[in-house]
Design a protein with these regions (language model features):
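Active-site helix of classical SDR
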Residues: 131, 172
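Substrate-binding pocket helix/loop in short-chain dehydrogenase/reductase
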Residues: 107-120
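Conserved glycine-rich Rossmann-like NAD(P)H-binding loop of the short-chain dehydrogenase/reductase
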Residues: 37-54
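Conserved glycine-rich cofactor-binding loop
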Residues: 16, 23-25
Length: 274
């Protein structure tokens, strides 16, 4: 990142940010940039060892105070447990990054029912429930700390079109995009910065979890490149309701929204066979 704390319009210094899915990939990227900008962190994900290692790294590099809360957001009651944990520790969250999520590649008819359920539970239900629970506090933080409170929900370029063999994942991300854009409008008078981040193929563990190689000639974006897009949106005087990382991805998203739906799904269906 090239911007300084003083120049950044999004300045979370002295506040607390919660990052879900913080044990790898974009979650780690968000944690580092938020810590660099002076926020303390609440880190949650399933893998305690990774969270603890990240907390140590953030403390050594930035002097960050991190609270580690290991949770599986696919489990019933995970979000209420997380909120209760925050309340018991008297932690007031000013920035929420709903980064946790995953997809599985394959036809729906062949997918294990528990994994279909878990995709919806993490990508949709947990994101919605956590946002709903913390939104009043985020809005209060935005009033108390102008330019220092934000809601970032992880969508995807998959949100802009149906994707055969990633049907549940793409549909979930379409929900996240629509949900976030509506909240952007609902909260516009509070000063809360709200955006849906839509990355394309990125150098994370997504493809390993999805049991699928990226395929095709496209270059994977780095986590740092995606973070530059995310924080440029937060630094903007008027944070956009969504932001797509990468020029090629922006063109693809625009084309998907402009072409007939039947043609789009035929193209994505053919591409998903690669």
């Amino acid at each position: 990142m090239t911007r300084t704390h003083a120049a950044a319009l999004y300045n979370p210094m002295g506040t607390t940010a919660l990052v879900t899915g913080a044990s790898s990939g974009l979650g780690v990227g968000f944690a580092h940039e938020l810590a660099r900008r002076g926020a303390d962190l609440v880190l949650t994900a399933r893998r305690l060892d990774r969270l603890e290692a990240l907390a140590v790294d953030l403390a050594e590099k930035y002097g960050t105070v991190s609270t580690v809360i290991p949770l599986d957001l696919a489990e019933p009651g995970a979000v209420p447990e997380l909120v209760r944990n925050l309340d018991e520790r008297d932690i007031r969250v000013a920035t929420l990054v709903n980064n946790a999520g995953f997809g599985l590649f394959g036809s729906l008819v062949d997918a294990p029912s528990n994994r279909v359920h878990d995709q919806v539970a993490v990508n949709v239900a947990a994101l919605t429930d956590l946002t709903h629970a913390l939104l009043p506090g985020l809005q209060s933080a935005a009033l108390a700390h102008p330019h220092g409170a934000a809601l970032v929900n992880l969508a995807s370029t998959a949100a802009f079109q149906p994707v055969p063999r990633l049907a549940v994942y793409a549909a979930a991300k379409a929900y996240v995009l629509s949900f976030t854009e509506a909240l952007w409008y609902e909260t516009r008078a509070t000063g809360l910065k709200v955006t849906a981040l839509c990355p394309g193929p990125t150098e994370t563990e997504f493809y390993a979890v999805a049991r699928r190689s990226p395929g095709g000639p496209r270059r994977l974006m780095s986590v740092d490149e995606v973070m530059q897009t995310a924080f440029a949106a937060l630094d903007a005087p008027r944070t956009p309701p969504h932001v797509v990382a990468g020029t090629q991805n922006r063109i693809t998203a625009w084309l998907a929204g402009s072409a007939p739906r039947r043609a789009v799904v035929r193209v994505t269906g053919r591409l998903s066979r690669r």
